[in-house]
Amino acid sequence: MKTNHHGRVKTMVVMILLASVITGLKAAPPAPKKGNIALKSLTSITFNKDGILFLADPLGTHVYAIETQSATQPNPDKLNVANIDEKVAALLGVQVKDAKIVDMAVHPISKEIYLAVTRTGSPAQSLLIKIDHKGNLQPLTLNNVSFYETSLTDVPAPGTKLPKEWHSLNMAVTDMAFIDGELFVAGLSGEQFSSKMRRFVFPFTNQSQAVQLEIFHTSHDTYETHSPIETFLPFPINGQMNILAGYGCSPVAKFSLQDIRSNKQLRGVTLAELGGGNRPVDMIAYKKDGKDYVLIANSDRTMMRMSSEDLDKGKPLTTVVPGAYVNAGVNYLAIAEVGVMQLDDFNDKSFIVIQRNINDGSLNLKTMEKWF
């Protein structure tokens, strides 16, 4: 049967439209699942700006994302929960020594506080706790929830000999951040070049990109590929967006965000040494009087503030520091606050911290004014 010119045109139009529909269907984001999340571990949590909460379960080799409900009452200016460790332990029905707060994140809309908690002993358990505006603690069930999930395919297998004796399988995910539609996940992999940054487009498609990271370690006098990032954030330096990362013992290095996205292996630029025997536990970016700053909480030092101006002028460090506790590189302001174990932004006036009181040993969740 012959087909005239108009018939061929119609056929071509139909085929083009059909191809467009098929392409659109292929590009459609995956729908969330409905069911139970059974965590084997919980080492890191973070939000995106829409209130999606991401949960890292390295022992279960998964990262999950769940929608969270926001509070309707006005956001508080301040929040204080004294003896937070005792309250968490009481909620779990265990002694204080058997409950550990491993991470904290502030809901970007409601300003409610979310805690990642591990209960040790038998059976061990990882769970989420939410703190409302009045300081009340509520355990969150992960049963019958809508969620997204993606696999961590490169984490060290149980029984793997790790590069350092103090490394653990939980360090497969040490920190996470949501940047420009992607979840960045730092930690150890099961590969010889073990320090890694993974990227997952959200909603998850179970596909990821990763780059193996290397830095010059200013306390250890060597280029290291097995030191995991302890904490990191996106931060502009010299007009370009970078990942600013803190390492144990305790260099601070930058990685170009563009280079992270376009390389399989990448050597960062070490900009500062905060002193040996220390671990940066958290860092956040904030503005004060029109200037950009990074605030770093440390395990064995005071809090430290670095300015964007000083980071812009930072020169690469490529030689060992002359002593075990010597600092070097980018200048910082030492803040007279110690014992800060968790740190996040709260509002325009305050941070939220979990801090060990050096006078009585209590562990408290509280707001800290941005006066510096």
Name what the model sees in each region.
Residues 23-27:
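Sec/Tat signal peptide C-region and signal peptidase I cleavage site
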Residues 2-13:
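Bacterial N-terminal signal peptides that target proteins for export
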Residues 28-372:
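Sequence/structural signature of beta-propeller domains
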Residues 13-21:
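Bacterial N-terminal signal peptides
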